[in-house]
């Protein structure tokens, strides 16, 4: 029998989350230009979802200490859930793409070549840096984080990995597919030695919101 993978549901740390959210409110959201909003709404229109544009409001911190198992329907695309059961953990979600469809979708991916992603990553990095400084300079936060981890999160539930020592990553699953398509993908790799940004390499003027008209 081969075990292809497993993942625990994530349980994020209340203390670290509250600390990080305070820094999100301190840093604020990126200042979006008319071009940024125009591209976002054009993509949302194309995907037939509400044309809300890019986020301009910080959502309140939400969370529960106990979530019934039947409500746990989501998880990360990696082992972040397993990590969260071994050490106090949080993840940060900052507006760096366009809310226009399911994750891992072209509608989400296209913003990565635009100022939208650049701004979002910059602001998110500031929040992470401030949170790290808080944890390094305020030891009581670390104590509180571990207190929550030990006496709330793992009080009645202990982590056990589903993976055996002999289980290996299933990297063979896409071997043939990648051998076939990687040469085509390489044509689109960004070359920073020739272009200031990826849009310039692609020859796309920002923000292009409609398909250019073709001459008959």
Residue ranges and their predicted role:
Residues 1-216:
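Metal-dependent amide/peptide-bond hydrolase catalytic core
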């Amino acid at each position: 029998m081969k075990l292809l993978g497993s993942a625990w549901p994530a349980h994020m740390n209340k203390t670290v989350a509250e600390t990080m959210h305070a820094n999100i409110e301190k840093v604020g959201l990126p200042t979006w230009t008319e071009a940024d909003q125009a591209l976002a709404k054009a993509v949302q229109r194309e995907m037939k979802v509400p044309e809300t544009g890019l986020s301009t409001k910080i959502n309140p911190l939400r969370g529960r200490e106990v979530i019934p198992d039947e409500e746990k329907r989501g998880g990360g695309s990696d082992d972040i859930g397993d990590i969260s059961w071994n050490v106090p953990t949080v993840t940060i979600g900052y507006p760096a793409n366009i809310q226009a469809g399911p994750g891992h979708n072209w509608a989400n991916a296209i913003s990565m070549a635009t100022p939208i992603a650049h701004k979002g990553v910059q602001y998110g990095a500031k929040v992470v840096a401030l949170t790290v400084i808080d944890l390094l300079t305020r030891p009581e936060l670390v104590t509180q984080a571990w207190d929550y981890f030990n006496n709330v999160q793992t009080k009645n539930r202990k982590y056990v990995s589903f993976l055996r020592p002999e289980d290996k990553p299933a990297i063979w699953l896409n071997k043939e597919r990648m051998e076939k398509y990687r040469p085509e993908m390489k044509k689109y790799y960004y070359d920073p030695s020739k272009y200031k940004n990826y849009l310039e390499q692609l020859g796309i003027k920002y923000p292009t919101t409609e398909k250019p008209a073709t001459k008959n």
